[in-house]
Swiss-Prot record:
UniProt membrane topology term: Multi-pass membrane protein
Keyword Membrane: yes
SS bond list: none
Enzyme class: translocase
Family: Belongs to the cytochrome c oxidase subunit 3 family.
Residue spans, topological domain Mitochondrial intermembrane: 35-40, 106-128, 184-190, 257-261
Transmembrane segments: 16-34, 41-66, 73-105, 129-152, 156-183, 191-223, 233-256
SUPFAM superfamilies noted in UniProt: Cytochrome c oxidase subunit III-like
UniProt protein name: Cytochrome c oxidase subunit 3
GO CC annotation: mitochondrial inner membrane; mitochondrion; respiratory chain complex IV
Subcellular location(s) of the protein: Mitochondrion inner membrane
Gene name linked to the record: MT-CO3
GO molecular function: cytochrome-c oxidase activity
EC numbers on record: 7.1.1.9
Length: 261
């Protein structure tokens, strides 16, 4: 057995990046098949393989960081840089959606009736479900901060309570968003308004689901005493991600729901 003379984690060969990439390919291809041929077989296969990859990859990272001690301070620093870069890349993703929305809405073409929202589109009332969704996400931002402070103070019980509240609010937001989609009078195929609305809000909704999953994993880990006030980057990354989701929603609400209506 050899002993390394540095603090970096030399990761063992792993199949999960490959299976994750393949599952992403299956899901995106399956989404196209669902849209055009009304077949969900490929999408279901991709989603299932993605869930299996997530479970096993998360399991490996938890084992390496929590039980084997590979996540030294210098490794955690690298992970922090990685998470920051990931969130920055997500910012540019949403910047593209906002660009598409404002490009179309600030100078509506004659094809749109020369107005915004386009002729024939009945926008959602920003003071109804969208405002409730805003309140729900802002409240979840408060509860995730409460969870972080409780963890730093060593109060495990309060941290679990705050995490549970945050997860519940995230699930509630997703259900409200689904009900809102069900009640809209327009679809994703109704011109540029429908496509930008559903793409931007739907992509954000996907991020809420991902963030809720992230927080559920943190909740389950804390049930097994995985986090301490000194060793908790998994939770910290989830909290950063959740705050990012909150901020994006505020921009979506002001731009698409309030100003755009």
């Amino acid at each position: 057995m050899t002993h390394q003379t540095h603090a970096y984690h030399m990761v063992n060969p792993s199949p999960w990046p490959l299976t994750g990439a393949l599952s992403a390919l299956l899901m995106t291809s399956g989404l196209i098949m669902w849209f055009h041929y009304n077949s969900m077989a490929l999408l279901t296969l991709g989603f299932t393989t993605n869930l299996l990859t997530m479970y096993q990859w998360w399991r490996d990272v938890i084992r390496e960081g929590t039980f084997q001690g590979h996540h030294t301070p210098i490794v955690q620093k690298g992970l922090r840089y990685g998470m920051v870069l990931f969130i920055v890349s997500e910012v540019f993703f949403f910047a593209g959606f906002f660009w598409a929305f404002y490009h179309s809405s600030l100078a509506p073409t004659p094809e749109l009736g020369g107005c915004w929202p386009p002729t024939g589109i009945i926008p959602l009332n920003p003071l109804e479900v969208p405002l409730l969704n805003t309140s729900v996400l802002l409240a979840s931002g408060v509860s995730i901060t409460w969870a972080h402070h409780s963890l730093m103070e060593g109060n495990r019980k309060h941290m679990l309570q705050a995490l549970f509240i945050t997860i519940s609010l995230g699930v509630y937001f997703t259900l409200l968003q689904a009900s809102e989609y069900y009640e809209t009078s327009f679809t994703i195929s109704d011109g540029v308004y429908g496509s930008t609305f559903f793409m931007a809000t739907g992509f954000h909704g996907l991020h809420v689901i991902i963030g809720s999953t992230f927080l559920i994993v943190c909740f389950l880990r804390q049930l097994y005493y995985h986090f301490t006030s000194n060793h908790h980057f998994g939770f910290e990354a989830a909290a950063w991600y959740w705050h990012f989701v909150d901020v994006v929603w505020l921009f979506l609400y002001v731009s698409i729901y309030w100003w755009g209506s």
